[in-house]
């Protein structure tokens, strides 16, 4: 036991690994935040949270009514908005569309023009994506009893079809019958829907597994690689209990540390997603989560999270054993890291190449990469082809984990006890020629240290590529109001002149019939229904009034001599609207931290700061 605690102290006793783990956890949080930030195609986290609060005090049936009604309303408003948008562009054939959808216009047109609708997001299109997704999720879990009935019905129907009875291996018929038996005991499972975005994002974020792999490399570096490269491992192995017992202690320290790493990484995920999206009630059944509805265990979400952590720990330990073995057996550190990453990459290629329905699907799932796909293991049900008989996916993966874990553990202990494991000789490179020295300057030398020696050029290139990707994939929706506003502002852009004033006065003539009708309605000569014919013109008039009041009457009086410009694009470019400026500030701070973090530290470490 003393050896075990000694190995643990190597990991946690100093400041190196805890600090690096904190950096990895922060990187994981940053990537998670960047991956879930609101975009043109992705609603903000606050919207999921607000809808969850709205649904929390409703029954399952009431949730369905609310989501379907809200979806119908938003879909209708989006269609009406598209109608007005086409109208603003001078589209033709819209009269027939209005007649064909008269009921929709009667129900929602006034709501659209008055903007009395409530939104959980910033605009109707994002709102439509939100409720389209939530309605689909609800319909999936609400039909859980139908799904179970369908499994049983399909089993009874297909078992009588000759093509299944005459199958040479009998696999298809056995698979159908086994699936029906597994789901037969789940008919009394209660369903309580809640938006799954927060929960499923926290436990399925792909970058967390990559950061987990990076932490394995760090643990292997501390427990194995440093001691071998420094020659300390040879001394340790010469002591009593320095071989087999030490090897076992290192593996035990590795698996214990790995559990802490998992708890930190997924704790960060769950905490962030809980604060941003909300995870929902922990006591609802796991079948209430649409992505995990096919789970065959009768457990709650909280119990699933506990099993998820344990299963992920087991899969990570198996992959970590290979990382430890590769780090130990390689003569040089670089070869060890390449070997540690090569096998998982090869297994990922095998997994991607074999279809899930292939008769070789056992090979697809019996590898290290599949062991880390925990939701696939626990949250789904699948039978694999095993010499003509169906075998469950959990059975295949648990046997694989046990077999690989045993083989790799024995291999690590054997190599640790019997191999020489001497430190590699340092390479010396004698150049047949001498470099010519060139005059330099302080600025040039500091720039070289910053960009090349400190790696700032790599970070700058990565951030530049990320910025280009963001720019290429960015989307912006222009509604009818903005189309009309752009029409007016582009005509009067530039210095304010008599020509611009006269043009705006001419444009007012277009609204004369509508304004006269409004006066007659106010005097009681006409009913308010008479204004329905001017709905599209009212929207254009609101943009006209915006130009007059905000830009002419207010801005030009406050800033005499100023030029007018269509400013919407500039506001988006410089982050005056939305929250993109917050993201840009965080990214700029991160870039500065990465670029300048080692600039002074490397001089101070070598004592060069005193010389300089």
Give the predicted meaning of each segment.
Residues 24-77, 83, 154-227, 248-328, ...:
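Secretory targeting signals
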Residues 3-12, 221-260, 442-446, 597-612:
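Helix-loop-helix units of permease transmembrane domains in multi-pass membrane transporters
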Residues 278-285, 355-374, 425-430:
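Juxtamembrane non-transmembrane "cap" segments at the membrane-aqueous interface
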Residues 17, 24-26, 31-32, 314-323, ...:
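Alpha-helical transmembrane segments of multi-pass membrane transporters/translocases
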Residues 34-37, 333-366:
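Transmembrane helix segments
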Residues 16, 242-243, 332-337:
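Membrane-helix interface segments
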Residues 38-157, 475-551:
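Membrane-proximal extracellular/periplasmic loop immediately following the first transmembrane helix
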């Amino acid at each position: 036991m003393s050896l075990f605690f000694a190995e643990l102290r190597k990991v946690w006793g100093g400041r190196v690994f805890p600090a690096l783990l904190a950096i990895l956890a922060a990187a994981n949080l940053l990537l998670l935040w960047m991956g879930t930030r609101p975009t043109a195609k992705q609603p903000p986290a606050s919207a999921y949270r607000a809808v969850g609060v709205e649904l929390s005090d409703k029954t399952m049936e009431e949730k369905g009514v609310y989501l379907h009604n809200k979806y119908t309303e938003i879909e209708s408003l989006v269609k009406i908005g598209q109608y007005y948008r086409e109208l603003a562009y001078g589209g033709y054939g819209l009269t027939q569309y209005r007649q064909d959808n008269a009921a929709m216009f009667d129900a929602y047109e006034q709501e659209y023009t008055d903007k009395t609708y409530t939104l959980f997001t910033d605009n109707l299109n994002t709102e439509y994506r939100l409720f389209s997704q939530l309605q689909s999720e609800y319909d999936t879990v609400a039909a859980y009893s139908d799904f179970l009935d369908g499994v049983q019905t399909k089993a009874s129907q297909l078992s009588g079809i000759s093509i299944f009875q005459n199958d040479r291996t009998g696999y298809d018929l056995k698979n159908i019958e086994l699936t029906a038996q597994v789901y037969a005991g789940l008919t009394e499972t209660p369903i309580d829907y809640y938006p799954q975005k927060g929960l499923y994002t926290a436990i399925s974020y792909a970058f967390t597994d990559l950061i987990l792999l990076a932490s394995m490399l760090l643990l292997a570096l501390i427990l194995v690689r440093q001691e071998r490269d420094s020659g300390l491992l040879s001394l340790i192995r010469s002591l009593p209990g320095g071989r087999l017992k030490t090897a076992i202690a290192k593996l035990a320290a590795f698996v214990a540390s790995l559990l802490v790493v998992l708890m930190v990484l997924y704790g960060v995920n769950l905490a962030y997603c809980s604060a941003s999206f909300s995870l929902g009630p922990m006591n609802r059944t796991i079948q209430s989560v649409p992505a995990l509805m096919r789970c065959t265990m009768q457990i709650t979400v909280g119990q699933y999270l506990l099993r998820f952590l344990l299963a992920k720990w087991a899969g990570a330990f198996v992959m970590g054993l290979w990382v430890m073995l590769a780090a130990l057996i390689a003569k040089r550190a670089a070869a060890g890291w390449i070997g540690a990453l090569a096998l998982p990459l090869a297994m990922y290629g095998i997994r991607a190449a074999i279809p899930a329905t292939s008769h070789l699907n056992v090979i697809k799932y019996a590898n290290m990469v599949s062991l880390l796909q925990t939701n696939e293991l626990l949250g789904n049900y699948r039978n694999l082809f095993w010499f003509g008989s169906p075998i469950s996916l959990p059975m295949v993966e648990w046997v694989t984990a046990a077999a690989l874990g045993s083989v790799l553990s024995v291999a690590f202990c054997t190599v640790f006890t019997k191999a020489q494991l001497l430190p590699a000789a340092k390479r010396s490179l004698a150049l047949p020629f001498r470099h010519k020295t060139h005059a330099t300057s302080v600025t040039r030398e500091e720039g070289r240290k910053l960009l090349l020696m400190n790696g700032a050029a790599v970070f700058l290139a990565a951030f530049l590529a990320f910025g280009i990707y963001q720019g290429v994939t960015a989307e912006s929706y222009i509604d009818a109001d903005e189309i009309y506003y752009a029409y007016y502002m582009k005509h009067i852009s530039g210095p304010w002149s008599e020509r611009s004033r006269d043009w705006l006065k001419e444009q007012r003539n277009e609204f004369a019939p509508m304004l006269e009708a409004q006066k007659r309605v106010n005097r009681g000569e006409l009913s308010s229904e008479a204004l329905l014919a001017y709905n599209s013109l009212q929207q254009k008039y609101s943009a006209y009034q915006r130009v007059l009041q905000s830009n002419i009457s207010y801005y030009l009086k406050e800033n005499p001599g100023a030029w007018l410009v269509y400013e919407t694009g500039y506001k988006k470019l410089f982050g005056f609207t939305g929250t993109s400026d917050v993201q840009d500030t965080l990214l700029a701070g991160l870039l500065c931290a990465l670029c300048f973090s080692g600039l002074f530290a490397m001089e101070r470490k070598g004592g060069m700061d005193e010389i300089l």
